[in-house]
Amino acid sequence: PQQPFPLQPQQSFLWQSQQPFLQQPQQPSPQPQQVVQIISPATPTTIPSAGKPTSAPFPQQQQQHQQLAQQQIPVVQPSILQQLNPCKVFLQQQCSPVAMPQRLARSQMLQQSSCHVMQQQCCQQLPQIPQQSRYQAIRAIIYSIILQEQQQVQGSIQSQQQQPQQLGQCVSQPQQQSQQQLGQQPQQQQLAQGTFLQPHQIAQLEVMTSIALRILPTMCSVNVPLYRTTTSVPFGVGTGVGAY
């Protein structure tokens, strides 16, 4: 009768002691694996998504602006521009309201006799231009006036920037002059091509062209038909349609 009593508590003690050792290492082991799997895929997905959309729209906007600026450039033969040089001088000086505001402030009004001479020369050359090319020719004259004013403004800015450098560095003047000549050549080529018109210059081109189209045909008694253009003008600038 003494043997079965001590065996039962020993077996139950061994069974209870083995259960926690088998259950404890199984529960915490999958938890760190789940944390690593949740954190690791989240980091690469959020970083590239924030950097992609910032760089994409800016080159597209620059290309659209350059395309619209190129569409506003009149294409005329150089011989026609040389032929209408008296008209350019007449419009550029104070004989007409097309003259630039800076030029009006800097100098006085020309004499009526000189304006009359330029008017006669312009009216002699304008009827010789073919009728279909007169509108683009007048537009090209205004365009060349805007570029000439832009070159003068840039030249004055460059001369102001070069004055303090020449006072501080008098030894390397030949090298500076050669570098300045090399740097001015591509700028003049860019202005000649006309691919860097600013929005305010495009609006100025439209306004000055409309004024010139009111002055020259009436002054010279010449018909200048306006042809509807298919290109879109940016920034709300419109072109007139009709005939003088």
UniProtKB/Swiss-Prot annotation:
<dbReference type="Pfam" id="PF13016">
    <property type="entry name" value="Gliadin"/>
</dbReference>
<keyword id="KW-0708">Seed storage protein</keyword>
<comment type="function">
    <text>Gliadin is the major seed storage protein in wheat.</text>
</comment>
<feature type="compositionally biased region" description="Polar residues">
    <location>
        <begin position="35"/>
        <end position="48"/>
    </location>
</feature>
<dbReference type="InterPro" id="IPR001954">
    <property type="entry name" value="Glia_glutenin"/>
</dbReference>
<dbReference type="InterPro" id="IPR036312">
    <property type="entry name" value="Bifun_inhib/LTP/seed_sf"/>
</dbReference>
<protein>
    <recommendedName>
        <fullName>Gamma-gliadin</fullName>
    </recommendedName>
</protein>
<keyword id="KW-0758">Storage protein</keyword>
<feature type="region of interest" description="Disordered">
    <location>
        <begin position="18"/>
        <end position="64"/>
    </location>
</feature>
<dbReference type="InterPro" id="IPR016140">
    <property type="entry name" value="Bifunc_inhib/LTP/seed_store"/>
</dbReference>
<dbReference type="GO" id="GO:0045735">
    <property type="term" value="F:nutrient reservoir activity"/>
</dbReference>
<comment type="similarity">
    <text>Belongs to the gliadin/glutenin family.</text>
</comment>
<keyword id="KW-0677">Repeat</keyword>
